[in-house]
Amino acid sequence: MSLLAIGINHNTASVDLREKVAFGPDKLGPALEQLREHEAVNGSVIVSTCNRTELYCDVKQGARNKLIDWLAQFHQVSREDLMPSLYVHEEQAAIKHLMRVSCGLDSLVLGEPQILGQVKQAFSDSRDHQAVDSSIDKLFQKTFSVAKRVRTETDIGGNAVSVAYAACTLAKHIFESLSDSTVLLVGAGETIELVAKHLASNGCTKMIVANRTKERAQGLAEQFGAEVISLNEIPDYLARADIVISSTASPLPIIGKGMVETALKQRRHQPILLVDIAVPRDVEAQVGELNDAYLYSVDDLQSIIDSNIEQRKVEAIQAEAIVSEESASFMTWLRSLQAVDSIRDYRKSANEIREELLSKSLQSLAAGADPEKVLRELSNKLTNKLIHAPTRALQSAAEQGEPAKLTIIRQTLGLDDL
């Protein structure tokens, strides 16, 4: 049994190569079936995301080049094109790499939590295709517990490092409960969709989506039970909003100082948080001059993000220490399994010798042989049979001039205690 991890990621390979070597839904099943039948593979999991493609395998000795050849052939990529971007980790290094990946320590965004879900899904897919053996199963189960420990003992995932998440985090800090807040989302693009997802996951149920075309916003609104309005209707709805988060491609501001001033009067000066993550601005800078209007720009969020990235780097030091400790512990456990197999084989061999000689001795006794003679013969033959292999090993080590090996055998046999 030997653990092997091979792959490419955003640090080693271009987008073009990552696309060529990706395992999409149509390729994953056939690939796992091929690995399941591969002569050099006992068990495998394929992790394939937009930023990485990796194989984690329990393999027989000498499987490294065979797996690299398989990966290249499966995707019809030349080995020469693949090798400069490929990394290979074996045994404890493979264990540590998987744990680092699952904890977000090897991600493009340090500490991002999504990768753990992707690794769990990859493991589930492999189990569904009967591609997982006991060693791979135990490795991934251990990895998931390590990832949980890292999340529990460190705050590596607790600081916002995306604009969308930072906007929601800011809103949470200012308002005690998002479940009681009405949020006006201006725009319906990818960033606003991410904002809506973060808001919903934090209990926000009252959202209004404003967009230039209502049709484009309808799909987003249906996901979160939001109202849909046009940009022209914003002045009529602004007073209802406790929080405004805006991200459009408009060349000119959409929300002006006068519009916000009117809304604040209608709200009897209950404060409004405005988070403008558009470039160029969606909200006039002068809005920040108003009492009870708290305006944050994308630059303000970026300073929060930069600070949080530095904090994640600090937390990553402790996370790396946990991964190093846990990967070493798991490797020790794996090695002990190899000893268990050897001990079982050794006991089986000794029992077979005992049963063979005991059977012959019982036959002799049944035939009327002298009991004392039978017992002496049994003890002599049993001794000779049991010490035969160790004797040969001692002789071989001495003849080949291997004093270190000779010392190990003597210690194993307990000869130094005599």
Curated annotation (Swiss-Prot):
SUPFAM superfamilies attached to this UniProt entry: Glutamyl tRNA-reductase catalytic, N-terminal domain, Glutamyl tRNA-reductase dimerization domain, NAD(P)-binding Rossmann-fold domains
Signal peptide: none
Residues annotated as binding NADP(+): 187-192
Positions annotated to bind substrate: 49-52, 107, 112-114, 118
Residues at the site labelled Important for activity: 97
Alphabetical list of InterPro entries matching this protein: 4pyrrol_synth_GluRdtase, 4pyrrol_synth_GluRdtase_dimer, 4pyrrol_synth_GluRdtase_N, GluRdtase_CS, GluRdtase_dimer_dom_sf, GluRdtase_N_sf, NAD(P)-bd_dom_sf, Shikm_DH/Glu-tRNA_Rdtase
Name assigned to this protein: Glutamyl-tRNA reductase
Organism: Vibrio parahaemolyticus serotype O3:K6 (strain RIMD 2210633)
Gene: hemA
